[in-house]
C-alpha cells in the first residue's frame, strides 16, 4: 500500500530543522555505534551460554560414565562415589545464574527506539517533524486534546514509503486508508486518528506504521505515543519495554506543566527508571534564531523548577542539557529550540548506560566463574600433591602402631603373669566370700542340707567357676587396657585425622580402613569377649575345672553348704596357672593384632586404588581447567571487560613509540579514563593459544588489588581494526613511570637508592606470592622507577597462579632458575631471579656477568645454568650481600630463602651500609653516582 505523490526520493532524507542535518548525523552515528557494540555483547553472551552448556554436558557425561562403570580399570563403590562427587563438586557449581542470564538476554533482544511523548498531540507531531527534518505529520489540523484520538504511530525504515495499519508485533490489517486514495504531503489526519464510530477492537488497538527511506530510521525506529485519552502513557511504555529500549523525549510548548502533565510524569517515574529528554518546541511560524539574546536563566524557568520538584532534574545540572561527566544517563531540559542537537548527547548517555550495565553484569559472571576455576585448580593441585603423602604417612604410622602394640604383647607376658598372680591374691578373699554367698540358678538346694544329685552338684560347681572366671576376666582386661592407653595419645589422633581426610570423599559404607584401625587399638578391650567365645583360654580353664571335679572324692553326693561352696572356689583358684593364662592372653592379643594389621593393610590398598582412580580423574579435570575451561572463559571475560572500558572511555589514542618487546609494542598515551599520563601496550595474539594465555594473564592482573609496588593496569580495549583492519589487537592501558631499572643503573644510582629498589622489588614479589601468583620474569627492564626512584614491578605477562602453571619454559634466560627447564617449579623461581637482579643492583652497572657473557647462544647459556654457572663475585660486593645472592640463586629450590626472610636481611644491610657510609667510606660496595 504505497502512498502516491510523496515528497521523499530514493536517497535517505536528512532535512533542515533546529538540529539540522548535523543532529541527524550525530543521532545516526550514536545509534549505529550502539547497534555495533550491542552485536558484540550479543555475540559474547551467545558464546558464554554455549560455554556453560558445554560445561554442563561435560559434567553430565562424566557423571554418567562414572555411574555406568566406564573408563576405569579397578572400580568399586568407593571409586564411583569419589569420581561422581569430584565432578559434582567441581563442575556443577559452574553455571550461568538464571537471573543474570534473563536480564542480559532481554537487553540483547531489545533494539532501541525513540519514543515521543508530549503535552498534546500537536506538539508531539511537531517534534517528530523536527527530528526527521520533513513535514510528515500535520501540526495544526488535529482537534483539541480533549477530543483527540491520535493512535500510536511507528516510523520505520524501508526502501519505499508505505502507510499501513498493523497490530503491534503481529499482523497488518486490511484497511483502506485515506493516504492510499491520492496524493498527500503530510499523512492525512483521518489516518492518524481512531474514528469514534469504529467498534472494531483490532482497529482501535492498531498502530499506524509508516516506512520511509530516511537516514535516521535506518538506525532506529521512532514511536509517537497515542493521546492520553486513548491509552495511558504508562501502559504504552509497559508494552514497549518488553521489546525495545526507549529513548524517551517529552515535547513541551507551554511555559509550565499542567496538573495532568505532572500526573503523567509522576506515573512514569513511579513505574519506570528511564531518564527523559524534555524539549520545548518552538511556536509554529516563529523563526529559529540564535537564542543567546533571549536565553532564560535556568533557575528562573518554571519548567525547570517543576521538573526538579518531580525528581527528574537536579539543581546541580545545567538545564540546557550539556553533556556532563556522569556515566549514568540523566534527564535533560532543553528550552532553546536550536539545542535540539543535545538529543544526540542524551541518547548516547541512555544507550551507553544500558550497554555498560550489561557488559559489567556479564563480566561479573565471567570473573566469578573464573575465580571458581582458579580456586578449584588450587584445590585439585593440592589434592594431587597431598593425597599420596597422606596415604604413605598413614601406612607408616599404622605400621609403627602395630609394632609398638606387638612389642607390648611380647614384652609384657611376664608382667601379665605377675599381674594375674597379684590380681588373684588381691581378689582371693573377695572371690571366696562371693562364692560362699552366691545363689545358684536353676538348682534347688534343700534348706536342711540334704545331699543332692550328681547333676545338681556339677551345675553348682560350674556356676562357681563362671563367677570366678568373669570377675578375673574383668580385672585382667582393665589392667591390660591401661597398658596400651598411652598409644592413643602418640599415634591415634594424627592417624585418625589423616584417615578421615582420605575417606571423606568416600561413602559411609566403605569406611573400613578406620574400622580396622579401631580394631588394632581396641584389641585389649576384647579380652573379656574372647573368654566367652570358645577361645583357648576358656578351654584351658575348663580343663582345670574338670581336674578339680575329679580330685574331689566323695562316697555319696555331698550336701550344698557354705563350707562346700567356699572349698570348691578355693580349689578352683589354687588350680589356676597364672603363667599359662598370661601366655594365652598375649597369644590371643597377638592373633587379633595380626589379623587387624593385615586387614588394615588390605583396606588401605583398596583405599589407595580408589584414590588412584580419583586422582587420575582429578588430574584430567585439572588439565581441562588449565588448558580449556579457564582460558576460554578468560577470553570472554577480556572481551566483556574491554567492551565496558571502550564504552566508558573510548579507544585510546596512540602516541609515540616507547619501546618494543617480544609480545607487543609500547606507546605513549597522554590521557585515558581520567589517568594521565599512561603507557599503552598493544599485543597482537598470533593464534588461539596466545589469545587465551593473554586473556588469563589479563584476568590475574585485573583481579589484583592495587599495590604501590606494582604498576597499575587501568584497563583494556580490543581494537578490531588494528593495522588498518588486518589484525585484532588488545590494548592494555597502564600507569606510565619515569624509566626502567636498566636505564637507571646506566645513568647511575646511589647505593641507598639501589638498596631501596631491591627492598621495593622484594615487597612487590611478596605481594604477588601472597595472591598465589608467580611472576616468572623478574629482570631489570621489568622493574620501573618513578621520579623518586621508587620501584614498581611491571609486565605481568608471564604471571600465573601456581595451580594454573602448565610447566611452560618462560622468562629471560639469564634470570631463569634451573628447574624452569624441567617444567616443574614453584614461586621460588622468583627468588632465584631476584638473586640475579640483586647482583646487578649491587654491581651498580648493567654489564653481564662473565659466566653469561661468554655464552655464544641461548642454548649454551641454558646448559651452563643447568650445570651450575652463576655470576662471579665482584670486588665491590659486601660479604652479607654476596651470601644473600648465593642463597637466592641456589640450585636447590628448597634451600633458597623465603622472601619474608630476605626482606629484613636487606633492611639490615641497608641500615648498616648506608649509616656507615654517611660516617666513613664504604668498604663493601662502591657508591655509583
UniProtKB/Swiss-Prot annotation:
Keyword set includes Transferase: yes
Location of region: Disordered: 1-21
InterPro entries named among the record's database cross-references: Dual_SerThr-Tyr_Kinase (IPR051302), Kinase-like_dom_sf (IPR011009), Prot_kinase_dom (IPR000719), Protein_kinase_ATP_BS (IPR017441), Ser/Thr_kinase_AS (IPR008271)
Recorded coiled-coil stretches: 189-215, 395-431
Biased composition (Low complexity): 1-14
Enzyme Commission numbers on file: 2.7.12.1
Location within or outside the cell: Cytoplasm; Cell membrane; Apical cell membrane; Basolateral cell membrane
Assigned keywords, A-Z: ATP-binding, Cell junction, Cell membrane, Coiled coil, Cytoplasm, Disease variant, Hereditary spastic paraplegia, Kinase, Membrane, Neurodegeneration, Nucleotide-binding, Serine/threonine-protein kinase, Transferase, Tyrosine-protein kinase
Sites where the protein binds ATP: 658-666, 681
Catalytic activity line of the entry: L-seryl-[protein] + ATP = O-phospho-L-seryl-[protein] + ADP + H(+); L-threonyl-[protein] + ATP = O-phospho-L-threonyl-[protein] + ADP + H(+); L-tyrosyl-[protein] + ATP = O-phospho-L-tyrosyl-[protein] + ADP + H(+)
Group of enzyme by EC: transferase
Keyword Ion transport: no
Outcome when changing residue 29 to Q: In CAKUT1; uncertain significance
Active site: 777 (proton acceptor)
Signal peptide as annotated in the record: none
Molecular function, one GO term: ATP binding
A Gene Ontology cellular-component term: anchoring junction
Membership in a protein family: Belongs to the protein kinase superfamily. Ser/Thr protein kinase family.
Function: Acts as a positive regulator of ERK phosphorylation downstream of fibroblast growth factor-receptor activation. Involved in the regulation of both caspase-dependent apoptosis and caspase-independent cell death. In the skin, it plays a predominant role in suppressing caspase-dependent apoptosis in response to UV stress in a range of dermal cell types.
Name assigned to this protein: Dual serine/threonine and tyrosine protein kinase
Protein source organism: Homo sapiens
Lineage summary: Eukaryota, Metazoa, Chordata, Craniata, Vertebrata
Amino acid at each position: 500500500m504505497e502512498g502516491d505523490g510523496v515528497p521523499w526520493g530514493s536517497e535517505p532524507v536528512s532535512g533542515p530543522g533546529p538540529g539540522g542535518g548535523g543532529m541527524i548525523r550525530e543521532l545516526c552515528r550514536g545509534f549505529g555505534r550502539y547497534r555495533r557494540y550491542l552485536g558484540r555483547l550479543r555475540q559474547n553472551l551467545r558464546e558464554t551460554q554455549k560455554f556453560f552448556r558445554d560445561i554442563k554436558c561435560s559434567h553430565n557425561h562424566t557423571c554418567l560414565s562414572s555411574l555406568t562403570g566406564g573408563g576405569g580399570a579397578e572400580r568399586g563403590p568407593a571409586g564411583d562415589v569419589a569420581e561422581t562427587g569430584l565432578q559434582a563438586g567441581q563442575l556443577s557449581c559452574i553455571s550461568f545464574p538464571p537471573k543474570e542470564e534473563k536480564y542480559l538476554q532481554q537487553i540483547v533482544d531489545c533494539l532501541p527506539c525513540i519514543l515521543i511523548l508530549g503535552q498534546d498531540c500537536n506538539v508531539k507531531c511537531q517534534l517528530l517533524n523536527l527530528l526527521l527534518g520533513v513535514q510528515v505529520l500535520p501540526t495544526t489540523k488535529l482537534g483539541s486534546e480533549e477530543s483527540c484520538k491520535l493512535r500510536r504511530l511507528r516510523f520505520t525504515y524501508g526502501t519505499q514509503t508505505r502507510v499501513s495499519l498493523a497490530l503491534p508485533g503481529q499482523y497488518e490489517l486490511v484497511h483502506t486508508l485515506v493516504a492510499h486514495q491520492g496524493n498527500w504531503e503530510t499523512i492525512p489526519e483521518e489516518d492518524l486518528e481512531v474514528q469514534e464510530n469504529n467498534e472494531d477492537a483490532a482497529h482501535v488497538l492498531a498502530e499506524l506504521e509508516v516506512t520511509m527511506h530516511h537516514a535516521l530510521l535506518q538506525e532506529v525506529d521512532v514511536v509517537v505515543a497515542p493521546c492520553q485519552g486513548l491509552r495511558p502513557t504508562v501502559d504504552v511504555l509497559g508494552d514497549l519495554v518488553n521489546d525495545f529500549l526507549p529513548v524517551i523525549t517529552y515535547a513541551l510548548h507551554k511555559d509550565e506543566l499542567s496538573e495532568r502533565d505532572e500526573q503523567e510524569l509522576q506515573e512514569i517515574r513511579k513505574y519506570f527508571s528511564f531518564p527523559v529528554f524534555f524539549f520545548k518546541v518552538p511556536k509554529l511560524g516563529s523563526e529559529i534564531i540564535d537564542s543567546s539574546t533571549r536565553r532564560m536563566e535556568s533557575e528562573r524557568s518554571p519548567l525547570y523548577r517543576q521538573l526538579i520538584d518531580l525528581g527528574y532534574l537536579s539543581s546541580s545540572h545545567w538545564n540546557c542539557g550539556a553533556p556532563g561527566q556522569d556515566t549514568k544517563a540523566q534527564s535533560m531540559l532543553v528550552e532553546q529550540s536550536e539545542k535540539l542537537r543535545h538529543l544526540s548527547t542524551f541518547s548516547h548517555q541512555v544507550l551507553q548506560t544500558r550497554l555498560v550495565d550489561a557488559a559489567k553484569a556479564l563480566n561479573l559472571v565471567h570473573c566469578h566463574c573464573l575465580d571458581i576455576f582458579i580456586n578449584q585448580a588450587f584445590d585439585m593441585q593440592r589434592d594431587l600433591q597431598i593425597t599420596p603423602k597422606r596415604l604413605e604417612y598413614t601406612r607408616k604410622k599404622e605400621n609403627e602402631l602395630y609394632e609398638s602394640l606387638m612389642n607390648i604383647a611380647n614384652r609384657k607376658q611376664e608382667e601379665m603373669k605377675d599381674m594375674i598372680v597379684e590380681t588373684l591374691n588381691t581378689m582371693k578373699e573377695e572371690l571366696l566370700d562371693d562364692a560362699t554367698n552366691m545363689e545358684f540358678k536353676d538348682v534347688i538346694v534343700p534348706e536342711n542340707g540334704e545331699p543332692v544329685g550328681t547333676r545338681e552338684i556339677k551345675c553348682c560347681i560350674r556356676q562357681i567357676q563362671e563367677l570366678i572366671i568373669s570377675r578375673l576376666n574383668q580385672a585382667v582386661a582393665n589392667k591390660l587396657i591401661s597398658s596400651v592407653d598411652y598409644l592413643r595419645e602418640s599415634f591415634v589422633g594424627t592417624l585418625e585425622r589423616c584417615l578421615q581426610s582420605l575417606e571423606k570423599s568416600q561413602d559411609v559404607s566403605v569406611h573400613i580402613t578406620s574400622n580396622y584401625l579401631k580394631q588394632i587399638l581396641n584389641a585389649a578391650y576384647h579380652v573379656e569377649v574372647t573368654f566367652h567365645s570358645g577361645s583357648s583360654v576358656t578351654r584351658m580353664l575348663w580343663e582345670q575345672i574338670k581336674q578339680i571335679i575329679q580330685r574331689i572324692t566323695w562316697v555319696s553326693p555331698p550336701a550344698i553348704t557354705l563350707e562346700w561352696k567356699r572349698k570348691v572356689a578355693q580349689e578352683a583358684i589354687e588350680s589356676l596357672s597364672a603363667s599359662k593364662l598370661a601366655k594365652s592372653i598375649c597369644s590371643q592379643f597377638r592373633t587379633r593384632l595380626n589379623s587387624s594389621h593385615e586387614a588394615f593393610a588390605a583396606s588401605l590398598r583398596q583405599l589407595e586404588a580408589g584414590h588412584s582412580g580419583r586422582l587420575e580423574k582429578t588430574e584430567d579435570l585439572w588439565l581441562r581447567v588449565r588448558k580449556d575451561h579457564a582460558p576460554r572463559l578468560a577470553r570472554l571475560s577480556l572481551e566483556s571487560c574491554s567492551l565496558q572500558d571502550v564504552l566508558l572511555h573510548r579507544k585510546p589514542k596512540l602516541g609515540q613509540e616507547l619501546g618494543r618487546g617480544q609480545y607487543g609494542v609500547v606507546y605513549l598515551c597522554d590521557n585515558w579514563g581520567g589517568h594521565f599520563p599512561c603507557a599503552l601496550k598493544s599485543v597482537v595474539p598470533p593464534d588461539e593459544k596466545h589469545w587465551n594465555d593473554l586473556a588469563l594473564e589479563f584476568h590475574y592482573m585485573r583481579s589484583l588489588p592495587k599495590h604501590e609496588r606494582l604498576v597499575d593496569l587501568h584497563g583494556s580495549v580490543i581494537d578490531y581494526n588494528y593495522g588498518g583492519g588486518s589484525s585484532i589487537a588488545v590494548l592494555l592501558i597502564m600507569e606510565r613511570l619515569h624509566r626502567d631499572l636498566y636505564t637507571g643503573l646506566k645513568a647511575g644510582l646511589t647505593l641507598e637508592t639501589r638498596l631501596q629498589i631491591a627492598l621495593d622489588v622484594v615487597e612487590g614479589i611478596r605481594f604477588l606470592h601472597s595472591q598465589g601468583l608467580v611472576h616468572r620474569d623478574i629482570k631489570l627492564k621489568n622493574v620501573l622507577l618513578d621520579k623518586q626512584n621508587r620501584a614498581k614491578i611491571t609486565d605481568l605477562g608471564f604471571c600465573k597462579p601456581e595451580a594454573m602453571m602448565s610447566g611452560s619454559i618462560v622468562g629471560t634466560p639469564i634470570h631463569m632458575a634451573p628447574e624452569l627447564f624441567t617444567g616443574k617449579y614453584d614461586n621460588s623461581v622468583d627468588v632465584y631471579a631476584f638473586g640475579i637482579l640483586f647482583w646487578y643492583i649491587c654491581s651498580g652497572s648493567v654489564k653481564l656477568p662473565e659466566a653469561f657473557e661468554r655464552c655464544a647462544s641461548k642454548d649454551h647459556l641454558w646448559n651452563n645454568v643447568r650445570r651450575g654457572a652463576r655470576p662471579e663475585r665482584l670486588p665491590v660486593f659486601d660479604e652479607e650481600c654476596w651470601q644473600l645472592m648465593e642463597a637466592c640463586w641456589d640450585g636447590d629450590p628448597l634451600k633458597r630463602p623465603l622472601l619474608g626472610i630476605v626482606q629484613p636481611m636487606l633492611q639490615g644491610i641497608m641500615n648498616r651500609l648506608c649509616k656507615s657510609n654517611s660516617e666513613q667510606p664504604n668498604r663493601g660496595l662502591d657508591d655509583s653516582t
